[in-house]
């Protein structure tokens, strides 16, 4: 819907659309950690009496999150970091955060919680296990390779872009950390 905003230049629209993709991926990841595969919402919906969306597999959910982050990171208008002069944009997602979140998602997905020869939970009902909504269905070593490659890509980009860090507290007090958190 950002395309319909009047008096906003195309660069800002593309930046905000990329940020929105990172936000969606981060919210999906929060849910994924608790529930595994999720219904994938890829379009806007009108008011309807029912939304019958099937639950996706773990693999489909991870792919959806990673694809969103790849699309966001490939957007030239999404900056690597915000810098100190960009105070109007503080607290926003950046290319670095998109690439870092991708690493975190792939690491979590490759972990034994989802990637093992035996499902994490063996208690009935087993519908989610059988449908691969809470695990991959078998151990897949290539998931570790995907995670490793995402980390290599992140650190390669980090070297080319220079230094990157999270906001640091200016003083080691509760108020100093609170101020850094609120930036």
Label for each model-derived stretch:
Residues 47-51, 121-122:
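A sequence-level detector of short, solvent-exposed, charge-rich linear segments
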Residues 42-45:
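Outer-membrane beta-barrel translocator domains and adjoining extracellular loop/strand segments
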């Amino acid at each position: 819907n950002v395309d319909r905003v009047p008096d906003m230049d195309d660069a800002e629209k593309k930046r905000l659309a990329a940020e929105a993709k990172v936000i969606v991926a981060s919210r999906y990841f929060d849910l994924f950690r608790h529930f595994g595969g999720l219904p994938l919402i890829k379009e806007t919906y009108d008011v309807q009496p029912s939304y019958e969306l099937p639950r996706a597999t773990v693999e489909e959910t991870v792919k959806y999150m990673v694809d969103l982050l790849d699309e966001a990171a490939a957007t030239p208008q999404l900056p690597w970091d915000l810098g100190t002069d960009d105070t109007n944009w503080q607290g926003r997602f950046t290319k670095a955060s998109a690439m870092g979140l991708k690493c975190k998602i792939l690491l979590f997905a490759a972990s034994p919680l989802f990637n093992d020869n035996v499902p994490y939970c063996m208690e009935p009902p087993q519908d989610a296990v059988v449908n691969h909504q809470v695990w991959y269905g078998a151990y897949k070593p290539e998931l570790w390779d995907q995670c490793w490659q995402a980390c290599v890509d992140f650190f390669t980009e980090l070297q080319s872009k220079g230094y990157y860090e999270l906001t640091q507290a200016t003083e080691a007090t509760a108020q100093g950390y609170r101020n850094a958190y609120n930036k």
